[in-house]
């Protein structure tokens, strides 16, 4: 089974590149492939380059967690039995590291004393900000954000997305993996749409406000599904057509 196939994606410094698709489209596999954390029985073919050089296992090991960081999808990445401050500092008691953590917490609106809390004492939004804080402690150059907003209401989700925009504006490249096209087009510079593990559309985020600029019927249907295309009564303002039939004919699923 090919989880992701024929994917070609470039992320520049200061840019947010969003990858959008439904569950099972291969989005998270992409992030795990870049970070070298695929399941033991997975096979990867192709080339990943970082700063123009091939990102082999040795180089990835040196960069991972420093220049290359992952903001994971699941909050289960946090140890439920360890205070979050210790997790963010990776157990370091150095004053410089602790002060850096507090500075990062302040930046993301985490109140003093948060470092002494356990994950179960935090709200969903706070937990997401802890995960981001853990990632940015090393001032990364490439941030992979894997579904960073599940379970958050729109206001909280937009705040989280704003943090990634800040990182990009400071020079980092951000790979944003999400199923939420509305958030992606508000935040990203460009968007790639995956379906069945394949790229079916690549366009500037602005183009996803204008259906006529998109070439693939599935991408156009996503554009038409956005809130501005629905009435207050929950009725579509336009027809999406028989998209499922078209996709099954194209992808055999």
What are these regions (language model features)?
Residues 205-253:
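Short catalytic/signature loops enriched in Gly
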Residues 118-122, 126:
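Conserved ABC ATPase signature
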Residues 54-69, 208-212:
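ABC ATPase NBD coupling module
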Residues 137-141:
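A short, proline-enriched helix->beta-strand linker immediately N-terminal to the Walker B motif
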Residues 74, 80-93:
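Q-loop/switch helix immediately C-terminal to the Walker
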Residues 184-186:
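A short, surface-exposed alpha-helical micro-motif characterized by mixed small hydrophobic
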């Amino acid at each position: 089974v090919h989880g992701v196939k024929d994917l070609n994606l470039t992320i520049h410094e200061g840019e947010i590149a969003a990858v959008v698709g439904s569950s099972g489209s291969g989005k998270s596999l992409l992030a795990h492939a870049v970070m070298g954390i695929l399941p033991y029985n997975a096979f990867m073919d192709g080339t990943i380059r970082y700063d123009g050089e091939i990102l082999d296992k040795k180089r990835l090991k040196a960069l991972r967690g420093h220049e290359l960081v992952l903001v994971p999808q699941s909050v289960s990445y946090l140890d439920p039995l360890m205070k979050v401050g210790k997790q963010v500092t990776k157990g370091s008691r150095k004053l410089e590291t602790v002060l850096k953590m507090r500075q990062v917490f302040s930046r993301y609106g985490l109140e003093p004393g948060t470092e002494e809390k356990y994950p179960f004492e935090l709200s969903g939004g706070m937990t997401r900000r802890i995960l981001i804080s853990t990632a940015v402690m090393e001032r990364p150059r490439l941030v992979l954000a894997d579904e960073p907003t599940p379970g958050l209401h729109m206001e909280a989700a937009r705040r989280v997305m704003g943090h990634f925009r800040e990182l990009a504006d400071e020079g980092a490249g951000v790979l944003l993996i999400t199923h939420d096209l509305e958030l992606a087009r508000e935040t990203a510079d460009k968007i790639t749409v995956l379906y069945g593990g394949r790229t079916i559309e690549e366009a500037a985020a602005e183009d996803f406000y204008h259906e006529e600029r998109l070439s693939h019927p599935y991408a156009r249907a996503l554009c038409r599904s956005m809130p501005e295309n629905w009435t207050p009564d929950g009725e579509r303002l336009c027809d999406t057509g028989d998209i499922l039939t078209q996709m099954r004919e194209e992808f055999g699923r």
